[in-house]
């Protein structure tokens, strides 16, 4: 009570003194000063939150493979991956670094396009794809579409750590086979990434005049301007110096009189030199950090140099290509639309083999995706390309994908197309071969479908097939001039069954490919039509931990069996062209077995592949492409090592 009274008296005294005063009451102000609270410390070194970019993926594309699967496999080049697909028939020339061909689900080499993050690696003159140009050790994912043609989209691996990353790949086998590749990558911040890869490769010396020497450089970078804008750039250079045998002299394919000393090449002193450079730079946008990119603008510069002097003639060109492309994606609930426009210009700096010195084209396309149900997707596509020489190409197609209770999946796709002749087929000029400016567009319809049944969590069976009806396809005629075909039909089908659990991977498949000329043109009567090909494949692998779980090992075999002879495609080196109409002796029936082992210990993998292990057992050797013998037995040993910090 006394304390309270004293306080009251003091307050009264102060108030009485302040009645006539205009001074600020400092005691009152101090009495309401808020208490000091602890302030949070600002960590200037805290990493910036950047959500990884998601690139746009075209509608209707299926997943083929990814980095997690590829790391256990050993492929000298990306063509080798296709050679062992269950739905493919391969036509290889015997050494890596060459223009190999693959018939994938009935789609021939001239119906295929490959896109590496915006770079179209098709040859602008011939339309062919060189699988050696694809940096397959850098692949993150692969998706494909089978409709009017075959389209493959390849996305490269991404790295999401700030520490530097490097890897070393080395493969070696007998004769002159060797692969050496190393990469260095660094995220300098959460926004900026740079990487550089060099790949040296060589093969050959198992037969005369088949040595291959090449290398590849990939420089790549991307930078986030902010959370929703990214700039990406890729430089890709491929260089090869190849001895060119122009095929080998074959009397009896069954006798297979080939080795490194006893083989007669059709050309004894021809060497080709190839250099291709691609550089693409683009800016891309997304609505927010959790969205897929919805808009982009790309500019691409490409330089193609090729030189091949031989006895009768010389192939030589230096072609420059400039292109620009823009796309925009619209998403409204279950409806998505992509619009795309592009323009390209092509001009020769040097040219000895084409009547055309330059050309250009513009393209427009749209894709539509509708998801009316959770297990149903319907897609549609329209594309148009207009070339400066007056030719126009179109394609209208679509399809649907249905999944039922994760047990049954059904997909079908189809297209009506009008495909332009290639620049080579129209304007080629050499001593022995000529283009034809009177060629018409190939027109037709293509239908593709596939069905897969998951019998349980381990067993899967399925089938797929393609039917094509067309006319005016371009072929090399009997007078060495390109001509249009009559009505043609082709059918291809595959059936397979697979078993997979934590210990075993087993798969068996059979592929049939048939081609028929319904109404042959007189000028094309010598062509080798009406061919049927059957390939049967079996794969069996066992996998698991070993050495007290210190290593994970995968071991198995792959077999290929072709039970009937058939007329093969033939690579015309003088044209740099895959003829569908080889007049050589049919390829005999053959079989092949490859044994593989891969083992991972921490960040190091050891891979081994015993190619053509049964060579000499039941057959002396075999061919996949007419006049080009496949290599004998060899053991490839490789090391994959990744380093951080």
What kind of region is each of these model predictions?
Residues 25-164, 169:
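Acidic, small-polar-rich N-terminal luminal/periplasmic segments of exported/outer-membrane proteins
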């Amino acid at each position: 009570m006394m304390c309270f009274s004293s306080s009251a008296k003091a307050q009264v005294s102060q108030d009485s003194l302040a009645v006539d005063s205009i001074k600020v009451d400092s005691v009152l102000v101090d009495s309401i000063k808020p208490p000091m609270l602890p302030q949070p410390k600002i960590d200037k070194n805290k990493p910036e939150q950047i959500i990884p970019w998601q690139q746009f993926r075209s509608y209707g594309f299926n997943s083929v493979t990814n980095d997690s699967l590829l790391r256990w496999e050993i492929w000298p080049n990306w063509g080798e991956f296709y050679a062992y697909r269950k739905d493919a028939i391969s036509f290889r020339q015997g050494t890596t670094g060459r223009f190999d061909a693959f018939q994938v689900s009935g789609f021939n080499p001239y119906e295929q396009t490959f896109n590496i993050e915006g770079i179209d690696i098709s040859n602008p003159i011939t339309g062919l794809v060189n699988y050696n140009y694809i940096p397959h050790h850098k692949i993150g994912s692969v998706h494909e579409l089978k409709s009017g043609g075959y389209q493959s989209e390849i996305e490269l691996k991404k790295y999401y750590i700030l520490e530097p990353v490097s890897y070393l790949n080395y493969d070696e086998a007998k004769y002159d086979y060797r692969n050496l590749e190393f990469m260095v990558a660094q995220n300098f911040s959460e926004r900026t990434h740079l990487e550089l890869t060099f790949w040296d490769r060589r093969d050959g010396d198992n037969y005369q005049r088949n040595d291959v020497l090449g290398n590849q450089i990939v420089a790549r970078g991307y930078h986030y301007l902010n959370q929703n804008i990214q700039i990406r750039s890729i430089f890709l250079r491929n260089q090869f110096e190849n001895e060119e045998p122009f095929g080998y002299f074959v009397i009896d394919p069954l006798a297979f009189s080939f080795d490194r000393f006893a083989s007669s090449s059709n050309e004894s002193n021809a060497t080709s030199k190839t250099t291709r450079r691609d550089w693409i730079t683009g800016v891309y946008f997304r609505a927010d950090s959790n969205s897929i990119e919805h808009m982009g603008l790309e500019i691409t510069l490409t330089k193609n140099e090729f030189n091949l002097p031989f006895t009768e003639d010389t192939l030589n060109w230096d072609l420059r290509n400039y292109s620009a492309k823009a796309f925009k994606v619209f998403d409204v609930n279950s409806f998505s639309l992509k619009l795309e426009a592009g323009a390209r210009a092509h001009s020769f700096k040097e040219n000895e083999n084409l009547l055309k010195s330059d050309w250009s084209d513009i393209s427009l396309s749209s894709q539509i995706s509708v998801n009316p149900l959770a297990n149903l997707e319907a897609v549609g596509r329209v594309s148009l390309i207009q070339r400066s020489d007056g030719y126009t190409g179109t394609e209208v197609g679509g399809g649907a994908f249905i999944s039922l209770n994760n047990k049954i999946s059904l997909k079908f796709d189809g297209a009506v197309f009008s495909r332009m002749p290639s620049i080579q087929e129209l304007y080629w000029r050499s001593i022995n071969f000529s283009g034809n400016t009177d060629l018409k567009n190939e027109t037709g319809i293509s239908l593709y479908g596939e069905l897969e049944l998951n019998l349980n969590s381990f067993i899967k069976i399925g089938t797929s097939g393609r039917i094509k009806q067309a006319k005016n396809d371009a072929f090399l005629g009997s007078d060495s001039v390109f001509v249009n075909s009559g009505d043609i039909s082709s059918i291809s089908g595959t059936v397979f069954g697979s078993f997979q659990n934590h210990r075993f991977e087993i798969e068996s498949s059979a592929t049939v490919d048939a081609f028929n000329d319904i109404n042959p043109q007189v000028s094309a009567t010598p062509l080798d039509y009406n061919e049927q090909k059957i390939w049967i494949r079996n794969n069996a692998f066992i996998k698991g931990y070993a050495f007290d779980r210190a290593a994970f090992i995968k071991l198995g075999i792959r077999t290929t069996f072709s039970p009937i002879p058939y007329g093969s495609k033939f690579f015309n080196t003088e044209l740099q062209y895959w003829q569908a109409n080889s007049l050589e002796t049919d390829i005999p029936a053959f079989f092949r077995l490859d044994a593989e082992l891969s083992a991972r210990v921490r960040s190091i993998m050891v891979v081994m592949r015993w190619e053509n292990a049964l060579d000499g057992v039941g057959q002396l050797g075999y061919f996949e492409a007419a006049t080009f013998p496949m290599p004998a037995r060899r053991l490839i040993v490789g090391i994959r090592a990744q380093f951080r910090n």
